[in-house]
Structure formats: C-alpha cells, structure tokens
C-alpha cells in the first residue's frame, strides 16, 4: 500500500504516480499449484511436480513430518508450512493473502491428489473467491489406481471416499449404495 503526501505537487507527483503504477503492474499475484504426490512409491512422482516443488516459494503440506521424507528424497529445500483438516480455514486465509502478495505455493498431501479425500477444497474455494490463479498437476489418486486394477467396470463409477465413523450414518450410506449400479469405490 502506498500513500502520497499532500506536499508533493505538479511534475514530481506525476513522476511518482507513474513509478507507482509501473510497480503495481510489475507486481505479480502468486499462484496455487495442487501437486499430486506418490501413494506408495516415491518414484511415481511426475517431473512437473518435482520442478514445481523446487520452484515455488512455499510448500503447504498436510503433514510436514511425512512430507519432509519426500522432499529430502528429491533434495528439495523449499520452505514448508502445515495445511491440514484442523487448521484449513484460518490457514487458507493466510495462504491466500500470501499469494495475493506474489508468493507461489504448492499444496501437497501425504499421498495422492489434494482435495480428493485430503485437504485442499477450502484453499481452492478461497483462491477462487480472491481471484488467485491455480492449477492442478495431475498424478496419483488412490481411487483411480484401485479402479484400474479392480477388473470391474470403469466407464461409470461412484466414489464415496471414507465412510463416516458414526454407525447410523455409515449404515444409512451403505443402504443407499445397495441401489447403486455403478462400480463403487470406498476407502
């Protein structure tokens, strides 16, 4: 934020304004990269994800203790912060502010694709609301891996992710799924 003092006038003010406009034009909004990570074998990571993790300013990780193994394996030194189920709303606000100030951020989960039964939804929603650009770098997703090796129909499927721990809710969902004709994927 810039404040011009009232004592600057005429040509001096015009020059300063011109410089400020150029600075503002040169300021870039950061970007969110949703980076899929390996679901078992570290070598399943894509080159694009590796390059992105090395180039961004910050990595937001579901569990930094878990993700450090991946980063160390590939000699990635990018700073990391936590972004998980229990801090997602407040942390998403913070991360969006960082991106609005030009910081590029990669979001990774412990395994698989952010937002698919892992943290990511809230941050993506807030990025859209704030006009922060984002992109998804495809890679492993456990549900698709399971589907492809199941031998079941793959053209149409239903992904329900994790069933609730509440017994009544779980029973209700299972009763609903009995009528489902598509292949069902559950975690």
Task: Describe the predicted segments one by one.
Residues 18-25, 29-30, 145-187:
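Beta-strand/loop-alpha-helix module characteristic of Rossmann-like adenine-cofactor folds
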Residues 77-85, 134-135, 155-161:
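Short hydrophobic/aromatic-enriched beta-strand-loop microsegments
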């Amino acid at each position: 934020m810039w404040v011009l003092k009232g004592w600057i006038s005429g040509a001096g003010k015009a020059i300063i304004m011109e410089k400020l406009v150029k600075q503002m034009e040169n300021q870039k909004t950061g970007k969110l990269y949703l980076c899929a990570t390996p679901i078992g074998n570290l070598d399943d990571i894509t080159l694009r994800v590796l390059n992105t993790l090395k180039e961004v300013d910050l990595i937001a990780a579901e569990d930094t203790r878990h993700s450090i193994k991946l980063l160390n394996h590939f000699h990635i030194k990018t700073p990391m912060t936590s972004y998980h189920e229990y801090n997602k709303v407040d942390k998403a606000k913070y991360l969006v502010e960082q991106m609005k100030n030009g910081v590029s951020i990669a979001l990774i989960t412990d395994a698989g694709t952010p937002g698919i039964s892992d943290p990511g939804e809230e941050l993506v929603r807030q990025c859209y609301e704030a006009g922060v650009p984002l992109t998804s770098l495809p890679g492993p997703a456990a549900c698709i891996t399971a589907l492809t090796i199941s031998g079941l129909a793959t053209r149409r499927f239903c992904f329900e992710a994790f069933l609730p721990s509440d017994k009544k809710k779980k029973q209700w969902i299972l009763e609903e799924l009995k009528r489902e004709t598509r292949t069902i994927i559950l975690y």
